[in-house]
Amino acid sequence: TIAAPAGAAHYGPIQLGAIHGSLDWINIMAYDFHGSWEATKKANHHAPLHQSPCDDAGADWSAKAITAYTRAGVPVNKLLLGVPFYGRGWSGVPAVNSGLCQAATGVPRGVYERGINDYEVLDAQGRPDSWDDATATHWTFNGSEFWSYDDERSIGKKADYVKGNGLRGLMFWELSGDAPDGRLLRSLRQS
């Protein structure tokens, strides 16, 4: 098995059609499409299933990566869609559209590094939730900080996509980011 990129700039040079014969399955790391390296760009979804309204046509998202792998000859039943048990954040975000697609001035503090927090930490903050049905993405916004992360609902939508498209399953990064009651892992199992 391998953990493989979901961004076209990273999977583009790989001979996907040639390598899959040596692999039982491929874990597509379908997260980190946006993050702290874009501190002064738009607050955006870091693990969207479908194209974000903030993105231009050249952007990456989960379903686009799956399509690219299958078009390159990788059997769909060898692909696992990755979901994050952490979120990416932006600070200095205007209070418009619950922060989505708004220009940021930086990245907020995180437990390990700026702009990244575990689901457990973000869920415990109790901020107002927002949902983007088109991208199957969850986020929170407190008036100046925007955090994009998968929750039970987004994992359920991604599981529906996996089942509906014949993928092998879901994988996640990283178990310690889950809430103490294991709700994200339980959501994966029940999906």
Regions found by a protein language model. Give the residues of each.
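Substrate-binding surface in catalytic domains of secreted glycosidases
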Residues: T1-N117
